[in-house]
């Protein structure tokens, strides 16, 4: 952390001693700067809000954000890093099932979870989806592949026109790192992601058919050409930038075909579960429809869950429950073989 003055530094360090293992954010402060509103969180809790008086050093809890969560039942999210095949340092997070650590975790079933965006990042903190998977016995690896934000301009620009190529290699290299460490059972690895992560799931199944025993694609892109043609109106001002960062549908057509999973379904050998919202404004439902149709024509096992009342990710509680129950059943079936 960087502080503007010694008083702020002393105050924050005093507060931090009361919350070992938690991140602390200041969400409000009075004009005299002696009364602060704090928000805490960790990898195992959404934390709480507190009011702190720096004059008499008193702390009062205002409210727990998620009082129903038992932190003792949650898993730790461990910061990790590995090297890509071309020498980039890739940071990420490994969440192990309860009771495991880096020393005793051996031959576990694994879910590789690339984030969406792709120009976003995974961060340390409570993630209910990751905790759900860890609770079901899976080790979960999240990685900030090239293009992820927060690592500088050079790392960001290293992703330009690298969808399905070096960006995908970063994900593959993370999977191989887990295998080499002995943490992953190489016969029980699935890949799951949403949006760009769904695209990375499909490309992972295409490029590494022997590495992944199953895949879950959640609102992912399958065809770079139709994806570009169906972007929402509010993205149209960015289309030229998309051509520069992802690829121009005319000038880079050969490359875009190479990295469009729908054209390489014949390379997929493992079962796939696809979930999609029919009213998705960002990734049109046709992206998933095309993929399912192509897989069925090739005789590749695929399950499809499409919801008419959903967009880019499920928001309705009943649909979310259905999706996670279906994914749990699918992973349990495919990774227990």
Task: Describe the function of each predicted region.
Residues 82, 108, 138, 212, ...:
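Conserved hydrophobic/aromatic "anchor" residues
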Residues 114-116, 276:
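The conserved beta1-alpha1 loop
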Residues 110, 132-144, 303:
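A fold-wide structural signal in alpha/beta-hydrolase
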Residues 1-91, 95-107, 119-136, 176-180:
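Peripheral, non-catalytic segments that deliver or gate enzyme domains
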Residues 143-337:
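Active-site-proximal cap/loop segments of hydrolase catalytic domains
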